[in-house]
Amino acid sequence: MVDSDSARLPYFNASPAEVRRLCRAGESGPVTAGMAAGYIQANIVMLPASLADAFHEFCLRNPKPCPLVGMSRPGDYRLPSLGADLDLRTDLPLYRVWRDGNMVAETGDIRDQWRDDLVTFALGCSFSFENALTACDVPMRHLQLGRGVPVYRTNIACTPVGPFAGPVVVSMRPFRSHHAIRAVQISSLIPLAHGAPIQIGFPEEIGIADIDSPDYGDPTEVADDELPVFWACGVTPQAVLAASKPEFAITHAPGAMLVTDMPIEGYEDLVASHRGRII
């Protein structure tokens, strides 16, 4: 992505704490893509403590869609390992509240929904490697257009654990072939942001019948000279909640992540070694 494209992302070089303050004040906008480059962004799942052990094991058995970067104690809305001033109830742009597998509300503040038995799971997000791609001048159309990344349910089943089962969900970004190679190279180095893609070029092989109709996010055109590249996605737990129907849960809304203080390991060296390369 050229410098003028980076300039369209006003919080690209913001600190994670600054982004969280914006979220807390309701001033961040609904999507955290392109914010706080060099740091891990996280999908959030909050479940009753009675389900925490099973969901923890589910994450460990499904590390591509659910790369675990943090887990709270029951009832604790602080997660110091991910941010010193962090409040899990207010520091995301938008949350979803779930009852019996149905999404019943979206809100920017869950303090009135908070329960003392909730355990929070933070799962790495592809926005982290998107920022690395941006820094390495690899263009992404949804960012250029100010849209959400398109996200799809697949025919790939997660490894089930206890009550938790459901399909792997993927995000898609179209690239010309040389940029696709670089996207694979760079994302492979960030396993906590889903790592390498799981499919390139053939959406029908993973059960996506209409690439122009994503299940979440916004449609993104795939040009004739481009390949659709699919990564495992942290929206997977929301598809799992819909299938597994726990009595209560809270998640992030798609695109509305927790921006953590956890640095991407080796980020500066990664960018220095890949920026300006053709392949």
From Swiss-Prot:
Molecular function terms, GO-annotated: lyase activity
Lineage: superkingdom: Bacteria
Keywords: Lyase
Lyase found in the keyword field: yes
Disulfide bonds: none
EC numbers, comma separated: 4.2.1.-
Key word Lyase present: yes
Signal peptide: none
Family that this chain belongs to: Belongs to the D-glutamate cyclase family.
NCBIfam families tied to this protein: PRK05463.1
PANTHER family assigned to the protein according to its UniProt record, in alphabetical order: D-GLUTAMATE CYCLASE, MITOCHONDRIAL
Name of the protein this chain belongs to: Putative hydro-lyase GDI0188/Gdia_2258
